[in-house]
Amino acid sequence: MAIYGIGTDIAQVSRVAAVLERTGGRFAEKVLGPDELRVFHARRARSEARGIAFLATRFSAKEAFSKAIGLGMHWPMTWRALQTLNHPSGEPYVVASGELADWLAARGITARVTVSDERDYAVSFVVAETDAETDAAPAPVPVSRTSS
């Protein structure tokens, strides 16, 4: 495997909460995929703070993923096309659907994700990898040197 790209993002939980309140919950429906949305509602029913933290981590993970694949939030990367779910052990993993899944498969791209949150912030880091046999990875950018 070769690294295709890396991405990181940090989200301020209070800003996510404010957007959620201002939109009457539509923000969660816009950003979360169907499986994420079910988890969000279940967590929010038990604890408003945990529900908002979950939404913030998923928002952050999508932003980090979009950076790792080099597209930002542009087709085929859409909010609902990527979900960050958890194995029973708690380890997060990403699941792509639709045109994003096709785009990733055509390039042999897989990804590893980690998310973390505290009271004020949620942070995510994504490493996108591709098969070493493919030419999908973007060329590395040489580091410039300044003369002293």
Swiss-Prot record:
Keyword Lipid biosynthesis: yes
Lineage top rank: taxon: Bacteria
Keyword field contains Nucleus: no
EC number: 2.7.8.7
Cofactors (names): Mg(2+)
Reaction(s) catalysed by this chain's protein: apo-[ACP] + CoA = holo-[ACP] + adenosine 3',5'-bisphosphate + H(+)
GO cellular component, one term: cytoplasm
Single annotated GO MF: holo-[acyl-carrier-protein] synthase activity
Keywords from the UniProt entry: Cytoplasm, Fatty acid biosynthesis, Fatty acid metabolism, Lipid biosynthesis, Lipid metabolism, Magnesium, Metal-binding, Transferase
SUPFAM superfamilies per UniProt: 4'-phosphopantetheinyl transferase
Compartment(s): Cytoplasm
Stored Pfam families: ACPS (PF01648)
Binding locations of Mg(2+): D9, E63
InterPro entries per the UniProt record, alphabetical: 4-PPantetheinyl_Trfase_dom, 4-PPantetheinyl_Trfase_dom_sf, ACPS, Ppantetheine-prot_Trfase_dom
GO biological process: fatty acid biosynthetic process
Record family assignment: Belongs to the P-Pant transferase superfamily. AcpS family.
Annotated NCBIfam families: acpS, pantethn_trn
Function field: Transfers the 4'-phosphopantetheine moiety from coenzyme A to a Ser of acyl-carrier-protein.
Record's protein name: Holo-[acyl-carrier-protein] synthase
Organism: Burkholderia cenocepacia (strain HI2424)
Gene that this sequence comes from: acpS
